[in-house]
């Protein structure tokens, strides 16, 4: 007896179901799911895999996304606790990690996340040996280093989301002050993601017009317009959002999808992302910090050599020293 499907559809060939543009998100917390929905809305993948250790939550999130399939162009959404669901991924995004407990030292948090990465990274590598790794978990610069060490991948394929979001926040706030869309406001925040990030005042421009040339006090303590406040707001904004809603999710999700788009579509756009910076700016240790990187199908193919002031360079070096101080204590 022919089934309804057999009566309706005449099959012409047995197809190999190997995905061509698969993306995996590890960790289905608020950040992981914001990354997932942002990627789905951009039609970047032909398959999306979700992985987590909490199976009920994982299945629920997968089903919820699958039920939106009519409105999406990603034909396959899968999930599992077992990493075999991640096989043949082009890009693997890591958002999983321990949350900082009240009063917990940064070093202690890092070590807890290292232990989590010691489980995640080898499993990812086993099933997708040629993937690019995009690290989002905090502290992102240190954990990108950890992922690089554990994976054994070449440095071009291990990328930290880094200052992509810090720079986006910076450009948004710049735009608010000037009444111009952030896309037309150019400015870069580099270095360590978070508190010790470095705004490059000399590079701020709209339509190629340097703000520093028009307003030489820009970013200094003498500045009557207090543009330094803009960077201060960038640093404080995450803490404020966390205080108000408990976590940040949407902006980082959109930021990660922006990076994923450059990688999956081989766009060769320039992003401030965390990469191995040894040998630049007088840095002699294996540390990852954000500098402008060209992102494409091989991950980071090139860096843009930014001219920094001696003060900016010193701040970058200080961040590198702080990170190395923590990294050399880590137990792998």
From Swiss-Prot:
Q: Which residues form a coiled coil?
A: none
**Activity regulation information from UniProt:** Fermentation of pyruvate to lactate is inhibited when bound to folliculin FLCN, perhaps partly by FLCN preventing binding of cofactor NADH.
Residue positions where N6-acetyllysine is found in the record? 5, 14, 57, 81, 118, 126, 224, 232, 243, 318
Q: Give the protein's recorded name.
A: L-lactate dehydrogenase A chain
The record's section on InterPro entries has:
L-lactate/malate_DH (IPR001557), L-lactate_DH (IPR011304), L-lactate_DH_AS (IPR018177), Lactate/malate_DH_C (IPR022383), Lactate/malate_DH_N (IPR001236), Lactate_DH/Glyco_Ohase_4_C (IPR015955), NAD(P)-bd_dom_sf (IPR036291)
What would changing residue 56 to A do, according to UniProt? Abolishes interaction with MP31
List the subcellular locations. Cytoplasm
Q: Which UniProt keywords apply?
A: Acetylation, Cytoplasm, Disease variant, Glycogen storage disease, Isopeptide bond, NAD, Oxidoreductase, Phosphoprotein, Ubl conjugation
Domain of life of the organism encoding this protein: Eukaryota
Q: What is its main location?
A: cytoplasm
Q: PROSITE patterns in the record, alphabetically?
A: L_LDH
Q: Which disease is it linked to?
A: Glycogen storage disease 11: A metabolic disorder that results in exertional myoglobinuria, pain, cramps and easy fatigue.
What does the entry state regarding organ or tissue expression? Predominantly expressed in anaerobic tissues such as skeletal muscle and liver.
Its pathway?
Answer: Fermentation; pyruvate fermentation to lactate; (S)-lactate from pyruvate: step 1/1
Positions modified as Phosphothreonine? 18, 309, 322
Q: In the record, which positions carry Phosphotyrosine?
A: 10, 239
Q: What does this protein do?
A: Interconverts simultaneously and stereospecifically pyruvate and lactate with concomitant interconversion of NADH and NAD(+).
Q: Where is this cross-link: Glycyl lysine isopeptide (Lys-Gly) (interchain with G-Cter in SUMO2)?
A: 57
As stated in the Swiss-Prot or TrEMBL entry, residues carrying the post-translational modification N-acetylalanine are 2
């Amino acid at each position: 007896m022919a089934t309804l499907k057999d009566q309706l559809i005449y099959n012409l060939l047995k197809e190999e179901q190997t995905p061509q543009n698969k993306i995996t998100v590890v960790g289905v917390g608020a950040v992981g799911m914001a990354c997932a929905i942002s990627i789905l809305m951009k039609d970047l993948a032909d398959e999306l895999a979700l992985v987590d250790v909490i199976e009920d939550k994982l299945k629920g999130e997968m089903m919820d996304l699958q039920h939106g399939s009519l409105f999406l162009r990603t034909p396959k959404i899968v999930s599992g606790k077992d990493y075999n669901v991640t096989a043949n991924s082009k890009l693997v995004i890591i958002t999983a990690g321990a949350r900082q407990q009240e009063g917990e030292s940064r070093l202690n948090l890092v070590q807890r996340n290292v232990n989590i990465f010691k489980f995640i990274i080898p499993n990812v590598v086993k099933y997708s040996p040629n993937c690019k790794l995009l690290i989002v978990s905090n502290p992102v610069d240190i954990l990108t280093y950890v992922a690089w060490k554990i994976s054994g991948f070449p440095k071009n394929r291990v990328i930290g989301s880094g200052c992509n979001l810090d720079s986006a926040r910076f450009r948004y706030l710049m735009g608010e002050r000037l009444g111009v869309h952030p896309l037309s406001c150019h400015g870069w925040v580099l270095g360590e993601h978070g508190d010790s990030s470095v705004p490059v005042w000399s590079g701020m421009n709209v339509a190629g017009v340097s703000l520093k040339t028009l307003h030489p006090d820009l970013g200094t303590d003498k500045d009557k317009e207090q543009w330094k406040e803009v960077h201060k707001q960038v640093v404080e904004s995450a803490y404020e959002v966390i205080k108000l809603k408990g976590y940040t999710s949407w902006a980082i999700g959109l930021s990660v999808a922006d990076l994923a788009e450059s990688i999956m579509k081989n766009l060769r756009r320039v992003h401030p992302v965390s990469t191995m910076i040894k040998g630049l700016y007088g840095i002699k240790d294996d540390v990852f910090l954000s500098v402008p990187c060209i992102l494409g199908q091989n991950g980071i193919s090139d860096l843009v050599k930014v001219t920094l002031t001696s003060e900016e360079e010193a701040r970058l070096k200080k961040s590198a020293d702080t990170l190395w101080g923590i990294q050399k204590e880590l137990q792998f």
